[in-house]
């Protein structure tokens, strides 16, 4: 089976390079940017296709590795040539339903999402061997798609079209939103006189240790800190020291920490903490 890519960005190039490293046959790339397609073809030692018609007719499976908001548009251009093919995209949020009227072409559609951050065209492929791929799409061939990745050593998971958005939100929280939390902590360290290098290194060590605990014990058993202890005075001092934007972010996260704390310590009284984090409308803290 020959696999090719419409779109020559980070995801398409990384997948192509990875597939080749695992012995898969990759035809090459087509892109509206000839320079990008040429670079991708050279990097993977494959072909640069000159048109959508050419790449589809030469391939058995075609990945649409274009920006999420362009998948449907590019599919409309490709649809007249897609007869009896396997069509896929790598969007986390979109399902295979974005390939409209695909049944009329005799092709089968899939969304195949690598659960990882693909940040570099040259190097990200090297980490794909330890990545989970979530698969959604036409059930007639889905077991073969799963086997394709299993044979390369990847973990796979089926997901329904209805759950794609919630799944992608979860992935964004664990990846992108964690960056935002780290960024806030970094800013505070810099305000305290740490150098950027110190802030990066020491906060990384702290975050890494916590992630390792979560991986080993789960969120509930890993929770520590002032919210878990019920230390309302410390939490209040934290919020008093923050500007409005950071305070709001801290507060929303602390509410979730309180939910975890109450599960960890069901016999502990968190009423005072709850009043700080979620004061009643008539309370003094809610007055403007």
What are these regions (language model features)?
Residues 261, 265-288:
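NAD(P)-dependent dehydrogenase/reductase Rossmann-like domain
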Residues 27-31, 87-90, 135-136:
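Short, hydrophobic beta-strand segments that form beta-sheet elements in well-ordered domains
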Residues 44-123:
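Rossmann-like NAD(P)(H) cofactor-binding subdomain of soluble oxidoreductases
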Residues 1-54, 58:
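NAD(P)+-binding Rossmann beta1-loop-alpha1 motif at the extreme N-terminus of oxidoreductases
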Residues 35-43, 106, 124-215, 272, ...:
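Internal alpha-helical scaffold of NAD(P)-dependent oxidoreductase catalytic cores
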Residues 212-267:
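Interdomain hinge/lid region at the active-site interface
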